From Swiss-Prot:
<keyword id="KW-0687">Ribonucleoprotein</keyword>
<dbReference type="GO" id="GO:0019843">
    <property type="term" value="F:rRNA binding"/>
</dbReference>
<dbReference type="InterPro" id="IPR036935">
    <property type="entry name" value="Ribosomal_bL9_N_sf"/>
</dbReference>
<dbReference type="GO" id="GO:0005840">
    <property type="term" value="C:ribosome"/>
</dbReference>
<dbReference type="InterPro" id="IPR020594">
    <property type="entry name" value="Ribosomal_bL9_bac/chp"/>
</dbReference>
<keyword id="KW-0699">rRNA-binding</keyword>
<dbReference type="InterPro" id="IPR000244">
    <property type="entry name" value="Ribosomal_bL9"/>
</dbReference>
<dbReference type="GO" id="GO:1990904">
    <property type="term" value="C:ribonucleoprotein complex"/>
</dbReference>
<keyword id="KW-0694">RNA-binding</keyword>
<dbReference type="GO" id="GO:0003735">
    <property type="term" value="F:structural constituent of ribosome"/>
</dbReference>
<dbReference type="InterPro" id="IPR020070">
    <property type="entry name" value="Ribosomal_bL9_N"/>
</dbReference>
<comment type="function">
    <text>Binds to the 23S rRNA.</text>
</comment>
<keyword id="KW-0689">Ribosomal protein</keyword>
<dbReference type="InterPro" id="IPR036791">
    <property type="entry name" value="Ribosomal_bL9_C_sf"/>
</dbReference>
<dbReference type="Pfam" id="PF01281">
    <property type="entry name" value="Ribosomal_L9_N"/>
</dbReference>
<dbReference type="Pfam" id="PF03948">
    <property type="entry name" value="Ribosomal_L9_C"/>
</dbReference>
<protein>
    <recommendedName>
        <fullName>Large ribosomal subunit protein bL9</fullName>
    </recommendedName>
</protein>
């Protein structure tokens, strides 16, 4: 049985793919749970239309993310924190702190776009990665200063 997946299914395929499955798996699991639709001519045409709409929307979002990356790339933010012995911070600098500091510079970003491989717990200069889109990554310079 050929079906078009409506969502990603592990070990089977990604959303929008045309896959062949056993009849029982399709009839008893995929179709009743609306995880797939039968691969009819009408459904294939609708799939192509949806792919075109998604590609156009994705291109528009990518363009906006690239514009924002150009603006954000020039920003250098400073965050002041209380420190203890050996320049260790009380607490850490989080993605929310960085988002607020960038907002103070005039650019708003979502804290979920900020990628911190590990928490910032010491004074110094850091380069923080912002994943604005799947294909667009910007970097800002962050300086953590003592209060």
């Amino acid at each position: 049985m050929k079906v078009i997946l409506r969502e990603d299914i592990e070990n089977l395929g990604k959303s929008g793919e045309l896959v062949t499955v056993k009849d029982g798996f399709g009839r008893n699991f995929l179709l009743p749970r609306k995880k797939a639709v039968l691969a009819s001519e009408q459904n294939l045409r609708q799939l192509e239309h949806e792919k075109a709409v998604i590609a156009a929307r994705n291109a528009k979002l990518k363009g906006a993310a690239e514009e924002q990356a150009k603006k954000i790339g020039a920003i250098k933010v400073s965050i002041k924190r209380r420190v203890g012995d050996q320049d260790k911070l009380f607490g850490s600098v989080t993605a929310l702190d960085i988002a607020e500091a960038v907002a103070a510079e005039g650019q708003s970003i979502d804290r979920r776009h900020i990628h911190l491989p590990e928490p910032i717990k010491a004074l110094g200069n850091y380069e923080v990665e912002l994943r604005l889109h799947r294909d667009v990554i910007a970097k800002i310079k962050l300086e953590v200063l003592p209060e």
